[in-house]
């Protein structure tokens, strides 16, 4: 293993990406409050005044995914006809799923229902059964097939250019060649890649900003240590080094094996909470109701902007999530494209949407309803039995991270389960951010053939950049401006993703015409 060998770095993309990120990070450290005020104003404008554009964009992505599954191009293979998949189906599913979760899924999966319980959407009454069902359903909706459809469409566009058109460049800009032509090789293409990379780095700090306090709280609960900023910095540093060493082993030996371990550990923790956490019947029954609520109200939940009631609920939650997924979509698309050679378009889209959604739903169903079951048993003992904990009281008085930790610790064998949960949170962040660092390195690589990976020092470098920026911004309480910047970047990035989709359909139609309609079933 030689970390310093591998494909050459494209300095025209690499250097500006690093420079812009570091410049803005320093600016946010120097002016955290002023930066946040200005960026928040822009963010509010984009979610309140332009939020409807995110709504229509995500629905268009969902419709495109359905077309790719059901339409005439579904059997088209991503690669040559003789190509076999590079990874087993189990490993492929695990690598897709763990790439997008990180610790954010553990965080929101356990606690998001509280926000919707306290401020119900769609006009439901606070504390009512409708509020409870919507509280459980909305998290699953936000992390469900709409988001994964967006990832899938972008991945197919990139994979087609990479595996079918045989362009040895794994970048977002390359997927726009069908529309932009040779301009992709000039400043326009470089700008697309640099812009996407910056937005992604901001999105990663959002995940670290959520996961670090949660993991630190878990360590403190287990060890009795005081929750301090120093301990949080140690957590981020350990994360960063683990991500870097995983990347040094490459895609097959490092990322795949870590993803497999993550899957086994996740289902171990989730399985214990489901079957032995004391709320089995409540979890399965309430999950069933939540799934029904989603399917019954999918169009309402998707299109609701609350223009009359003006609660801002769709803007603060649904639009925010759609913007977050837009920021992550290119990275997920590049990653899924890289690992999907030899699979058909239908397999890739259906696999991403179905298994990704199912995995996310399992986390929300078990973690969220376990937490809700604890709360209902504590506040309504005449109707609910089992382990009890006033989770909302802890949420209000101690904080979100401690509400999550105490919910896990309230299960039987609480210390053991919490230790497993902390390990799961750690590994989930490692697998998620490893994927991001791998993607950033791929985009900065001048030429990346199908059988190649980015130089390992390149991937390791981006892991260090992500960790160093997170530590620096945490020290100076400047994480939020960079996080907000990434969401602001989502609006123009939507335009790029539209170009990507249009370019793909243009290329595949032209190839189909040349082959005399070979894409027909």
Which residue ranges define each predicted feature?
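Membrane-water interface regions at transmembrane-helix termini and the short interhelical loops
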Residues: 1-6, 32-46, 65-86, 135-142, ...
